[in-house]
Each structure stands twice: as structure tokens, then as C-alpha cells.
């Protein structure tokens, strides 16, 4: 999933000779943390809402260029790259440039989150399991083999943390018995930190047990 599928042009970036008040109008209207600043076709940087609020409303935006933050994203970057840049720059907007450094539009964090929410990892039903293993032992192929040995199908996995000398992995999978998968991981030296699943059979047995209890109460 690439950035170029989510480029927006909902507003035109202000010109560098326009006043700070105009930049703030755009920021407030679209709920932005930053606004991109250009001098002609040359990208200068991103001015934060706080920088504009501290400046005089009649100052020209170009006068604030020394306070601009230099972050952009390429049109061929992935949405995961975008998430990292949003986080690193405490921003909800990323200017998108092509390989010639020309401005194509911008990327909004809400659009990226919406895009990621359509991934099979999110949409497909399944169990969520967080496992932990030493960094030396971490192997995607071994994790896949353990899951497959229990007739489980992995929908997706990713590394979520590095506590001390360990690696923590979040897995989403489809399995007949999540308990069997969990036990096998533990036999191979993994720690199962967390697991969540919805078991229809378990729900059925629970309902029948509750009905029996009600009958016995009568």
C-alpha cells in the first residue's frame, strides 16, 4: 500500500509572501498540526501551529522559515513509512514530493489509518497472540512452522517491541485450537504474553451451561 494512492489536494499551501493569519486559517479549518511552506516551487519546510500562533498575524510566512521543520515523504513510500514519519515529527500531515522534489499534494494521518484498516490483518477474523522470545532465537520461518504444525494459518505478524534482550511479536492467525498453538509455542521456548480469540463453540457450551443452571434453579 503506497502513499501515491492516498495523496490529497484539499487545500492549496499558502504562498510564502502571505501573512501568518492566512496560514492559521488553513490550519484551523483542516485541523492540521503543520502547514507546508514553499518559495515558488521550492519546498522550504513545515511550519507548526504553535510557531504560527506565537508569531504576529501580519508577519509574512517566509519570515518564519528558520523555524520550519524539514520533513516530507516520497510518493513511492509505504503507508508504514508514513506512520513512522507522522510519529517522529508529531504531525498529522506530510507533504508528498516526487523523485524530482516536486510537490504533489499531502498525506493526512486519518487517511493512512483508514487505508491500513482495510488490510486483511485487520479485517479478517482470527485470534491475536503476542509471543516473546530471545532475539537470537527469533525466526519468522520457525514461527510459521509452529503455527502450521497445529493446522493454523497465519494472516500476518509483526514485531511490536524489544523488551531487554527479547523480541515481542504480534500474530494474527486462524486456528481450530488456539490453546494447542499456545502450548506448542511454549514447548519451543516462547513466552505467550497475551492471546485473544472468539470461540463460537465455547460460546455455545457457555450458553447451554447457563440454561442448565437456570433449569436446576427452577
Model-derived segments and spans:
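Bateman/CBS regulatory modules and CBS-like beta-alpha motifs in cytosolic regions of diverse proteins
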Residues: 1-26, 37-39, 43-46, 57-85, ...
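Short hydrophobic beta-strand motif reused across regulatory alpha/beta modules
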Residues: 33, 45-52, 104-112
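Short acidic/polar active-site loop segments enriched in Thr and Asp
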Residues: 33, 92, 153
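Regulatory loop-to-helix N-cap segments in sensory/regulatory domains
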Residues: 54-56, 116
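Cytosolic regulatory modules rich in charged/polar residues
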Residues: 71, 99, 103-111, 115-218
Amino acid at each position: 500500500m503506497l502513499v501515491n494512492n492516498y495523496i490529497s489536494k484539499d487545500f492549496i499551501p499558502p504562498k510564502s509572501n502571505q501573512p501568518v493569519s492566512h496560514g492559521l486559517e488553513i490550519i484551523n479549518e483542516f485541523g492540521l498540526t503543520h502547514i507546508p511552506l514553499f518559495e515558488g516551487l521550492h519546498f522550504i519546510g513545515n511550519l507548526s501551529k504553535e510557531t504560527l500562533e506565537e508569531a504576529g498575524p501580519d508577519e509574512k510566512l517566509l519570515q518564519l522559515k528558520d523555524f520550519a521543520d524539514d520533513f516530507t515523504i516520497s510518493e513511492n513510500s509505504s503507508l508504514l513509512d508514513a506512520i513512522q514519519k507522522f510519529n517522529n515529527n508529531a504531525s498529522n500531515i506530510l507533504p508528498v514530493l516526487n523523485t524530482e522534489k516536486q510537490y504533489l499534494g499531502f498525506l493526512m494521518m486519518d487517511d493512512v489509518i483508514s487505508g491500513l484498516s482495510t488490510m486483511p490483518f485487520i479485517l479478517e477474523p482470527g485470534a491475536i497472540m503476542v509471543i516473546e522470545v530471545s532475539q537470537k532465537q527469533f525466526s519468522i520461518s520457525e514461527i510459521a512452522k509452529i503455527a502450521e504444525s497445529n493446522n493454523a494459518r497465519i494472516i500476518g505478524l509483526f514485531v511490536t517491541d524489544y523488551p531487554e534482550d527479547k523480541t515481542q511479536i504480534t500474530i494474527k492467525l486462524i486456528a481450530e485450537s488456539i490453546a494447542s498453538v499456545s502450548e506448542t509455542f511454549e514447548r519451543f521456548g516462547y513466552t505467550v504474553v497475551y492471546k485473544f480469540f472468539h470461540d463460537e463453540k465455547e460460546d455455545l457450551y457457555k450458553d447451554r451451561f447457563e440454561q442448565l443452571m437456570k433449569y436446576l434453579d427452577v
